[in-house]
Amino acid sequence: MPRVQVTTARHVWPGMEIGLLGEHQAANAALAVVTVEQLRALGLTIDDRAVAAGLAGVRWPARLEVLSRQPLVLLDCAHNLASAQAMIDTLHASFPGERSGRRLLIFGGNRDKDLEGMLHLLAGHFTHLFLTGFDNPRCVPAEGLLKLAPKSVPCTLCPNAEAAWLEARSAAGPHDLICVTGSVFLAGELRPMLVRDLANDLGNGQPQVLQSAAAAVR
C-alpha cells in the first residue's frame, strides 16, 4: 500500500498506509488526520490505531480502482480536466510498467463537461480510444466524441458501454492497460459488468482480479 507521513504542530504520524492511490488521496488523508486532531482537542477520544486502520481500510469504488492486473484494468470516474490529470499522474507514478504495452482508453462523458479538453489531455497517454455513450440523457454519443477527439490517436466508435468494454477486452493482451474514465455514469454502468467478467476470467485462469487499488502497488 502507499504510505504517507503527516507532521502537525501536535504530532508526527509516520508511515501510515493508505488504501487509495494518488498524491491527491495522500493530501486527503493528511486532512483527515488534522481533522482527528481537532476533534481530540474538543475532547473526543480517538486512538492512533483507529486512525491508521481507517486510512488503510478505506475503499472507494471507481476512484483509480484496479480490477485486474493482467491485463491492468483501471476504473476511474474522472469527469473534468483536474481529475483526469490526477488520474494520469497517479497512473504513471503507481504503474510505471504500463507504458511497455498498449494503453487502451474507454471514454464517455457528459455534455456539460469539457470533453474536448479531456480527450486531448488523455490522448497523449493512450494508444487507442474506444469512444462510447452510456444510458443517461446527459451523455454525448460516440459520434459526437469523435468530433472532439484529436486525430493523432486511432479511435473505435462503440454503440454502448458494454460494446466498448467487449471491444477493448478483446483487443488487450496480458501486458496491456485498459482504462475506463470520463463520467461517473459510465463508471457506474460498467463496474458491475467488469467485476463479473473479470471474476469469471479469474476462474478460468485469466485476468487477476484485485480487491483494492492499493494492493496492486508493488
What are the functions of these language-model segments?
Residues 38, 80-218:
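ATP-dependent carboxylate-amine ligase
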Residues 4-128:
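Nucleotide phosphate-binding/pyrophosphate-handling subdomain across enzymes
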